[in-house]
Design a protein with these regions (language model features):
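A residue-level marker of the well-folded mature domains of exported/periplasmic proteins
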Residues: 2-6, 27-358
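Secretory targeting and sorting signals
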Residues: 2-28
Length: 358
């Protein structure tokens, strides 16, 4: 049961003030003036709609890192509202933020908010998503083209295991949001593997089978229903750009009375791992949010303390970057998620899936 006192605080303050307030990252603030110049760092997270990772993982990991370093920080979530994210950026500046970890919602608002933060005297670290061509000082994320390559190689391995590789399988793609630079990089990655196979006839692309979904699983389900209809229910494998879209494909297959096909995923969600154990999903790309959050927090803390930013290992679109390596998770190595504390057995190995955990 949640602590009633914490709920009350969350309703009134709407912030996570590291070291000072234990509240959710998604509520509203009522009187920011009272906390003016009270923070050194700020985190602007994008939403709770397309992924639960921001509330379940990013916010608590970042909160812990800033608290350990003794750096007061404000963590906010825009709930997929660009205007709200802009207001939150203004709030961060009003409260004295010297550095902002910024995960944009879309390129247009992302560039505008970055300009706002920089003009207000804050250094910007693009977190997870890069605002291309912006004034950000650093970028922290995973190797996104490699994420896409892992997906493509994952479903290819599954097709070989099912002995349908070499039989001209029909393959579809459910992409993320065309406005999301990460989604475009994921697609760049899996297309670099799949397009040569489409071109030489090894695979056949499903009719109407390359669609953008806005990271919306409901829309993804509707689109995949249409893809099945256009292809006489004969789709042999599919890219799903995250576990939510994989779930949309799986629900569509079940509704049509069809058997499992190779399906990719991303984010290593409890449901995604359960589908992997049950044989409905081939795998999921695991990106250690803990490592990403800790790397980003370390960069922000270094800036606040006037020290050299650790871990810089490249440049992306002219921005100094800290790029991390993703992992493809299957039935063979899913326990890595438990070992690293990303998921708990109690989240996955329950109900009908308990007997599948070995």
């Amino acid at each position: 049961m949640k602590n009633p006192r914490r709920l009350a605080i969350a309703a009134l303050s709407g912030v996570i003030l590291v070291g000072l307030v234990a509240a959710t990252a998604s509520a509203r603030i009522s009187s920011p003036a009272k906390q003016a110049a009270s923070i050194k760092a700020c985190v602007l997270l994008p939403d709770t709609v397309t992924s639960t990772r921001y509330t379940l993982f990013d916010a608590p990991y970042l909160k812990a890192a800033f608290k350990k370093a003794g750096v007061p920080a404000l963590i906010l979530n825009a709930h997929k509202d660009p205007q709200k994210q802009k207001s939150q950026a203004q709030q961060c500046l009003a409260q004295g933020a010297k550095v902002a970890l910024f995960d944009q919602l879309d390129p247009a608002s992302g560039a505008s908010i970055t300009d706002l933060l920089v003009a207000g005297g804050a250094k910007v670290i693009d977190y997870d998503r890069l605002v291309v061509g912006s004034k950000a000082s650093y970028y922290v994320s995973f190797d996104n083209p490699t994420v896409g390559k892992l997906m493509a190689k994952g479903i290819i391995a599954a097709m070989k295991a099912k002995k349908i590789y070499g039989k001209h399988p029909v393959v579809s793609e459910l992409n993320g949001d065309i406005k999301d630079n990460n989604a475009k990089q994921f697609k760049q990655g899996y297309d670099s593997v799949l397009n040569p196979l489409f071109k030489n006839g090894t695979f056949k692309k499903a009719a109407s089978g390359d669609q953008w979904t806005d990271w919306d699983a409901i829309k993804g389900r509707r689109i995949f229903d249409q893809i099945l209809a256009r292809n006489g229910n004969k789709v042999n494998a599919s890219i799903a750009a995250n576990d939510g879209l994989a779930g949309a494909i799986i629900s569509s297959l079940k509704a049509h009375g069809l058997k499992p096909i190779p399906v990719s995923g991303q984010d290593a969600t409890p449901t995604g791992v359960q589908y992997i154990l049950a044989g409905w999903q081939s795998g999921t790309v695991y990106k250690s949010v803990r490592k990403e959050a800790n790397a980003a927090a370390a960069a922000a803390i270094a800036i606040v303390k006037g020290k050299k930013v650790p871990g810089v290992n490249g440049t992306v679109s002219g921005t100094k970057s800290i790029i991390l390596t993703p992992v493809w998770v299957t039935k063979k190595n899913y326990k890595l998620l438990f070992k690293e504390g990303f998921l708990k057995r109690s989240q996955v190995c329950i109900g009908q899936y308990k007997k599948l955990c070995k």
